[in-house]
Amino acid sequence: MTTTNNVLLVDDQHRNIGVTDDLHTIESLKSELTLDYDLPTLCGKNLDSPNILLNSIEKFKETFNKHYPFLEKINMKNLLIAGGSVSNIVRNKFQYGSDIDFFIYGLNQQEASSRVRQWLIDILVKKPDNSSEKTTTKKIDMTKYYKIIRNNNCITILLDHGDLKLQLIFRLYQSISEILHGFDLGSSAVGYDGENVYFTTLGKYCHEYSCNVIDTTRRSTTYEYRLNKYFDRGFNIVVPKLDLSKLKTFNLKYGEVEICELPYFIFSYQNIIGNKIIVKKFYDKYNIKSDYGLEPINSTNLYYQSLKINIGNLINDVDYYYYVSSHIDKQNTDILTKAPRLTKGDIITFYDGVRTKLNGKNIDVCLIRKYITIDTIENIVATMFHKDTNVKEYFDSIIEKQKELALNKLDILLQKNHNIVWITENPGKQLTSSFNPIIEVESKWYGEFYKE
């Protein structure tokens, strides 16, 4: 059994609810290690460049606080920052704009909801500066302007015009180890609790050897996208069951690339050296890029975008809404309990706007399909073009009926409880790692390139 497979075995043995062990601290990290390439590996152009890691908690804290000064003094009790934001600093490859993902552990649901409130206050509510020290350096307040978005899966703080995103995930864990063993990739299995940085055995291995290891039992709807993302950050991809003998090589003789088309993962490669496959490019076929359901929203137009999403979900009976705020204080954290960003006036104004667009010369079929549900698109179009139809009167009638339907649904929605609903159960094999796990046989991921 290879070293890589041994590491996967250790990880699998600790992927249990309530796990507390299999944690390594930052001081145990070793730099300048190189894979032995005993398994097929997708490699970037800097495949064997020196990998210098931070292995001092003091240096890590100094660097972390330099980049995120607004987090330096927050209370981290029962909180863990995990994933890429921590990994980037450990690897001396800080990337501004990386999401900062917070997780809660060791609390029940009521305690966790209170902890979210305190988290918001700690980060966003200003405390008086009692420092008597004089300084000529002007501090930049990164939290002066912010917006908060909440959906069913997480609450997100957008800072610096949306360039920086803090997320707290609505899933409860029992321990730090349980959080880290829930990640799908070793490159993400690293966390910071304000006092130390922790890795699982797999996380430590992947950071020391700059790699991720394909483990199809950890797949989710974002798995391949995340492999690609971390590859761009310098993590090669070990593909244990890839049959190298089935990779094409004819074009390589002429300095051209070949294509490997796995069922879920397509890439071109420009050379094969032993088990090293030198990748030229990945081909993006990823429709979902976040497990937490936060759609790409422009922070400057946040309210209108969230309104459109909420109306679309309301009329289509999709129980998934956005809650939005741009101000909190100690007495007001109602984004945790209030109804979604949606009022009767919003619905009336929105559908009056739809009416204006539909009464024009150009009929927007996509608009009708998305926001008109009282009849099928086929019936609406057929009626529009009927010789006896007064199109303006017809659309006026449709809009008024659709308004009434939406307003009735809103009345029902406003009567519901809008507190945080915490996810506490384990979705199958994946130990709470993904909101959208995919459980399939390993061979299906590899297709014709599978080697047992």
From Swiss-Prot:
Protein known as: Uncharacterized protein R883
Source organism of this protein record: Acanthamoeba polyphaga mimivirus
UniProt cross-references to PANTHER family, sorted A to Z: REDUCTASE, PUTATIVE (AFU_ORTHOLOGUE AFUA_3G10540)-RELATED
